[in-house]
Swiss-Prot record:
PANTHER family registered for this protein in UniProt: AGAP008170-PA (PTHR45712), PROLARGIN (PTHR45712:SF8)
Pro residues bias locations: 39-62
Location(s) in or outside the cell: Secreted, Extracellular space, Extracellular matrix
Post-translational modification: Glycosylated; contains heparan sulfate.
Lineage, uppermost ranks: Eukaryota, Metazoa, Chordata, Craniata, Vertebrata
Name recorded for this polypeptide: Prolargin
Length: 378
């Protein structure tokens, strides 16, 4: 009997292992419920809309202490005449309260200025519309701002200078637009304008007529740099102090062009095509000229300068030699007498000549003439 038990024990172990490998059958009439699928923790994002380069407007800010303050702007409590609507992704000019004198609307997406843009704010003195997308300006909208003195419309898409500008305008900044037209008489009533900035546009020689600048009796700064001019603009206002003509294609300066500018102290004509042939003698020998920029041209000889010139930039030209005796405004022999009147010594303090075909040392006659020189780059 003990022997039969030893034979029975392996058989029971085999049957137990087979039973463990088979799945258990469910009881009749009972169905197993499928395991629930895990639900997403957050709802699925909607399908993306069509791509656009215009971000949505910013949500309204907190209520202001001023009931008339636009919700999309900021009205500083300590500066009640100012309204800050800059960098708000605005598509249009909000309703401006009448108390506002200083309006900041730069860095938005405004595309036009319709007639009703500043309907209630006729006391505006300062308007900044830089870096928008303005293409169209109603011909009457700016004329309704009689107190406007500073208008900034840089980095927009204007194709012409806006019309009917306010008479009291002092600064007009229109750089980095697409301006290729200046309407006739647009500046004729701007006697108070001191600064006109038209750099980085598409202005050509045909745009400037003999009467284009007529009326700008007190203009002090004119910036026409980075345009496509080949000639000097005609009839520039005589009161001008600073003239910027960098990065054009000007080859020639008419004889005596600068003689009618008694206050002209600053000239920039870098990156043009000026050569000795296009520079008449004494072109820049102007009594009150203090700073002269002529770098990156094709000049071979140092032009004649006046006693009062303090800074001269001639780098990156075609100059091969420099003669202090020839370019000295006064008689160099007189400077050997140290008891001579030092008031007549040339005022030149900074001279830049690098990027030419010159090599050190600096000529002695150059140093004898320009005794006040503090820096020479060669």
């Amino acid at each position: 009997m003990r022997a039969s038990f030893f034979w029975l024990l392996p058989l029971l172990l085999i049957l137990a292992s087979v039973a463990q490998g088979q799945p258990t059958r469910p009881k009749p009439g009972i169905r197993r419920k499928p395991k629930p699928r895990p639900t997403p923790r957050f709802p699925q994002a909607p399908e993306p809309a069509e791509p656009t380069d215009l971000p949505p407007p910013l949500p309204p800010g907190p209520p202001s202490v001023f009931p008339d303050c636009p919700r999309e702007c900021y009205c500083p409590p300590d500066f009640p005449s100012a309204l800050y609507c800059d960098s708000r992704n605005l598509r249009r000019v909000p309703v401006i309260p009448p108390r506002i004198h200083y309006l900041y609307l730069q860095n938005n997406f405004i595309t036009e200025l319709p007639l009703e843009s500043f309907q209630n704010a006729t006391g505006l003195r300062w308007v900044n519309l830089d870096n928008n997308r303005i293409r169209k300006v109603d011909q009457r909208v700016l004329g309704k701002l009689p107190s406007l003195a500073f208008l900034y419309m840089e980095k927009n898409q204007l194709e012409e200078v806006p019309s009917a500008l306010p008479r009291n305008l002092e600064q007009l900044r229109l750089s980095q637009n697409l301006i290729s037209r200046i309407p006739p008489g647009v500046f004729s009533k701007l006697e108070n304008l001191l600064l006109l900035d038209l750099q980085h546009n598409r202005l050509s020689d045909g745009v400037f007529k003999a009467d284009t600048f007529q009326g700008l009796k007190n203009l002090m700064q004119l910036n026409l740099a980075h345009n496509i001019l080949r000639k000097m603009p005609p009839k520039v206002p005589q009161a001008i102090h600073q003239l910027y003509l960098d990065s054009n294609k000007i080859e020639t300066i008419p004889n005596g062009y600068f003689k009618d500018f008694p206050n002209l102290a600053f000239i920039r004509m870098n990156y043009n095509k000026l050569s000795d042939r296009g520079l008449p003698k004494n072109s820049f020998n102007i009594s009150n000229l203090l700073v002269l920029h002529l770098s990156h041209n094709k000049i071979s000889n140092v032009p004649a300068i006046s006693n009062k010139l303090e800074h001269l930039y001639l780098n990156n030209n075609s100059i091969e030699k420099i003669n202090g005796t020839q370019i000295c405004p006064n008689n160099l022999v007189a400077f050997h007498d140290f008891s001579s009147d030092l008031e007549n010594v040339p005022h030149l303090r900074y001279l830049r000549l690098d990027g030419n075909f010159l090599k050190p040392p600096i000529p002695l006659d150059l140093m004898m003439c320009f005794r006040l020189l503090q820096s020479v780059v060669i």
